[in-house]
Swiss-Prot record:
InterPro entries: Ribosomal_uS14, Ribosomal_uS14_bac/plastid, Ribosomal_uS14_CS. The keyword Chloroplast applies. Belongs to the universal ribosomal protein uS14 family. GO terms for cellular component: chloroplast; small ribosomal subunit. Pfam families: Ribosomal_S14. Its main location: plastid. The gene is rps14. Residues 1-23 are annotated as: Disordered. One of its GO terms (biological process) is translation. This is Small ribosomal subunit protein uS14c. It comes from Panax ginseng. Keywords: Chloroplast, Plastid, Ribonucleoprotein, Ribosomal protein, RNA-binding, rRNA-binding. GO terms for molecular function: rRNA binding; structural constituent of ribosome. Binds 16S rRNA, required for the assembly of 30S particles. Part of the 30S ribosomal subunit.
Length: 100
């Protein structure tokens, strides 16, 4: 189980990312349209003005039940060992164990 402070920090980053998403997207579109180098540098400066934690690269997908940041499956939103336990307990419909 991840510490609650780490989970809260991740939620705060998600809120910041949503807040500044439109600003980042619009300035990136401007960069592709502008041809002069000096104008591009000004727009790059605008991109650096939002807080660092608002960047989408700083977000991690976390397990829905444990908050574990590694080995997550996007389809289920669970980490690998929790997914395995739930499949063994037949709690996930349609998921089957592999056998060969």
């Amino acid at each position: 189980m991840a510490r609650k402070s780490l989970i809260q920090r991740e939620k705060k980053r998600q809120k910041l990312e949503q807040k500044y998403h439109s600003i980042r997207r619009s300035s990136k579109k401007e960069i592709s349209k502008v041809l002069s180098l000096s104008d591009k540098w000004e727009i790059y400066g605008k991109l650096q003005s939002p807080p660092r934690n608002s960047a989408p690269t700083r977000l991690h997908r976390r397990c829905f039940s444990t908050g574990r940041p590694r080995a997550n499956y996007r389809d289920f939103g669970l980490s690998g060992h929790i997914l395995r336990e739930m499949v063994h307990a037949c709690l996930l419909p349609g998921a089957t164990r592999s056998s060969w």
